[in-house]
Every structure is written in C-alpha cells, then in structure tokens.
C-alpha cells in the first residue's frame, strides 16, 4: 500500500515537473469590459478552443494553468478576439486599453508586443491618408496631383507593412510566433489564397513552420482554391 502511495505521489510530482505553468495577469481601463468574462483560446482541431476564463473585476483579470509546451493564444470577449498572447513559462502582464493592447514580461511576449506596436504605427499612417487627401484638396491642390502623391505613399506604406510582417515571421519560423502571426495575417482574408508574400514566406520555411496545424490546413485550402481559379 505504501509503495502504491509513493508511486502516485512520484507520478504527480513528475507530471507537474514535466509540464510548465503559465500565469497571465491582466488589467484594463476599458469601462465596457468591467464584469465581462474573458476567454483564453488556442487553435486546436481547426477551431479556437477555450482553455481558461476570467471575469474582469475592478479592472483586473487573471489566467493560470498548466501547459505541455509554449502556446500562442488569444484573449477573447465573447466571439471577438481582443489580443494575442504567448503562454510560456514566467509571469505575463497584459494591458488592455482603448487604443492599445500589450503583453509583456516574457521574451516572446515582449517580441510580439514590439512587433504589434510597429505595425500599429504603420496602420495609423495608412489610416491618416484620407484626412491628408481632404486637407490637400481643401488647400487647393489639384485632385490628380493629390491622388498621385497619396497613391505613392499608400504603396510605400503597404510595402513597409508587408516587409515588417514577412521579416517577423521569418525571424520566428522555429517558435510559436511565426505560425501565430501567419494565422493573424491570413485570418483577415475572405478565403485562403496564395499571393507573393505568402509564397515567399512558405518557400523558405522550415518543417516546424510548414507542419504547424493551421499553416498546413491553410496551405492545403489555398492551393485547392488557386487550382479552382485556374480552371475558370
């Protein structure tokens, strides 16, 4: 009986030591989140599976659990994704504000937040273009000239945005950030497609990236869609 008890205790200790713990401590000043339930979801079996939940109380929430390996997750409010976060060993600090979200405190989260901040700056410059167009026209600038100048700016910003995403994914081919950002990038498409940016990313990707469940499923669907388009 004692041997059995020792075996059970040893097995429990081994299981705990073989798994890693994650702790995500969050805060928010968004009034609409107070009292709401947030969900932590990960991609599994072609779906976003909830693995934890936490209610926002006095602007605070917390996720805590055990994981077998580092995972890319998303914080959800109902069916809407609020922000991505990496579940890795260590204490992760999440901040949700009206205009910016961040996850810091661990290496991969720091890297992800820095990337999102840089991308947000480019997105803000793109969003400013219609306002610049209105200003230039109001100042009497020829409309054709306005379209030419702002069109060039838009193309340059789109190229800068694509390069930022591609370089970040390539720099993180062998960890969860690569497939995770690829999933974020392609989730905005109406349906899976292949374009020069995706082809460049895939052409140089190692097996770890290509065999990620989401990447693998996306490429299968995209190649099928492109084949159908070629038949028309």
Residue ranges and their predicted role:
Residues 170-232:
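Charged, long alpha-helical assembly modules
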Residues 1-28:
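Bacterial Sec-dependent N-terminal signal peptides
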Residues 18-162:
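A non-transmembrane, solvent-exposed segment enriched in polar/low-complexity residues
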């Amino acid at each position: 009986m004692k041997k059995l008890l020792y075996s059970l205790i040893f097995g429990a200790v081994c299981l705990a030591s073989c798994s890693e713990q994650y702790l995500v401590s969050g805060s928010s000043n968004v009034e609409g989140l107070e009292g709401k339930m947030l969900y932590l979801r990960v991609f599994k079996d072609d779906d976003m599976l909830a693995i934890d939940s936490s209610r926002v109380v006095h602007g605070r929430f917390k996720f805590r659990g055990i994981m077998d390996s580092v995972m890319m997750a998303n914080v959800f409010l109902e069916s809407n994704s609020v922000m991505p976060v990496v579940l890795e060993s260590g204490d992760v600090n999440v901040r949700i504000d009206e205009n910016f979200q961040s996850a810091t405190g661990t290496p991969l989260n720091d890297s992800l937040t820095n990337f999102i901040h840089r991308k947000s700056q480019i997105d803000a410059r793109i969003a400013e273009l219609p306002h610049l167009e209105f200003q230039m026209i109001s100042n009497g600038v020829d409309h054709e000239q306005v379209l030419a100048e702002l069109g060039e700016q838009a193309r340059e910003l789109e190229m800068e945005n694509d390069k930022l995403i591609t370089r970040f994914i390539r720099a993180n081919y062998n960890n969860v950030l690569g497939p995770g950002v690829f999933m974020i990038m392609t989730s905005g498409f109406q349906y899976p497609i292949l374009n020069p940016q995706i082809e460049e990313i895939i052409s140089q990707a190692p097996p770890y990236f290509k065999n990620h469940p989401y990447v693998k499923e996306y490429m299968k669907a995209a190649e099928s869609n492109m084949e159908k388009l070629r038949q028309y």
